[in-house]
């Protein structure tokens, strides 16, 4: 029992001092951004989302904002949170119309809505929205690499 308690206390001490935990508690958005990027690159999308959600409101206009909002949108996509992914990709596309990632963001935003489409016997509001979004994408990017 003592070994278990000791192991438990050591694990708490180790995990409570992790860079991720420090970033979560930090007031510095640069620390949060750096850690969120690291978590994203390590494919720990849930962790990166927690940090991106904290810094997103204050991050507009900063030099790294385009990259941050792209990773934020992608993290939602990769965690299969398609409602949020669709919204964030649309927001990215409208906020950064000259981005080199605009076509991909527009496509993934539209595709997010298609992932929400239920089976044919259920209400097809999401399906109709997906069709509209995909048609808008096709109209905007008729020669896209994503069509095919």
Regions found by a protein language model. Name each.
Residues 4-6, 13-148:
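Acidic, polar-rich low-complexity tracts and alpha-helical solenoid repeat scaffolds
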């Amino acid at each position: 029992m003592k070994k278990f308690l000791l192991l438990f206390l050591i694990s708490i001490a180790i995990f409570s001092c992790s860079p991720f935990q420090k970033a979560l508690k930090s007031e510095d958005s640069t620390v949060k951004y750096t850690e969120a990027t690291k978590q994203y690159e390590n494919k720990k999308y849930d962790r990166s989302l927690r940090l991106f959600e904290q810094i997103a409101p204050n991050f507009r206009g900063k030099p790294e904002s385009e990259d941050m909002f792209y990773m934020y949108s992608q993290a939602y996509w990769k965690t299969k949170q398609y409602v949020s992914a669709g919204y964030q990709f649309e927001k990215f596309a409208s906020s950064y119309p000259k981005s080199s990632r605009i076509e991909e963001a527009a496509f993934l935003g539209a595709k997010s809505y298609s992932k929400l489409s239920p089976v044919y016997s259920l209400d097809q509001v999401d399906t109709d929205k997906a069709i509209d979004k995909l048609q808008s994408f096709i109209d905007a990017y008729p020669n896209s690499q994503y069509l095919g």
